[in-house]
Amino acid sequence: MLTDLLKWGGKRSETSSRGAEGASERDEPIVASKAFPKFVATLSQKESPVLLDLGPVIGSNVGFCGERLGCKLFIEDLLADVDRTLRGTAKTDLAGSMPTRFAHRDGSIDGILCWDLFDFLDKAAAQALAVQIVRMLRPGGAVMGFFCTSAVERSPFTKFEIVDDKTLRHRNHPGVGGKKVSLPNRDILRMFEGLVVADSFLLKNNTREILLRKKILATPSESEASASAATTPAKT
């Protein structure tokens, strides 16, 4: 498995324009996102955040993450793994490979971009990946994913190119595509046990954009203060 790591210096206030170049020359749709601006805002509050992208390498996305967020970026192209599985050329079972797929330490990632990856995973693979996402995510961190609201017998893969912090270009992907599975909200919450839904948006194309957050654990002193306040009678 190939992991691409890119380290950038400081943040820049201006958004990269590389993702928007040549937009008029393409017929690929540009779609406004509701969750992505909130995901960006969450990471912007952190100094040198660590970001994990589960999609393919896209140059303009790398540029945006470096220039806009000043982040350390890891790219783990799980869509390529799914493509190999559907083609019948995968060497390992997708669900079984998840526990060893990621070398990242527990609680070491500030943000994870899942895109629509979960739509193409079977139940076992989806659950195994969700466990790893919860494990790797740092308290206060965010996860963004797109989930279809109805099953599709066959759908092409999509590459999501960041145009700016509010819009994404839906680009064609050369993979074979596959069946899309619709996950009920309760199943998503159960899968990501330990995370909470910070925001959920239903778009006109019937895609649910979901932003999940990991709660920040209270420090021992904060816990003691809270317990003390709860047991101290109020003055009248």
What do the PLM-derived regions correspond to, one by one?
Residues 117:
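Hydrophobic adenine-recognition pocket in adenosine-nucleotide-binding enzymes
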Residues 1-43, 51, 58-101, 142-236:
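Class I (Rossmann-like) S-adenosyl-L-methionine-dependent methyltransferase catalytic domain
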Residues 120:
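A short His-aromatic
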Residues 112-113:
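Hydrophobic beta-strand segment of the Class I
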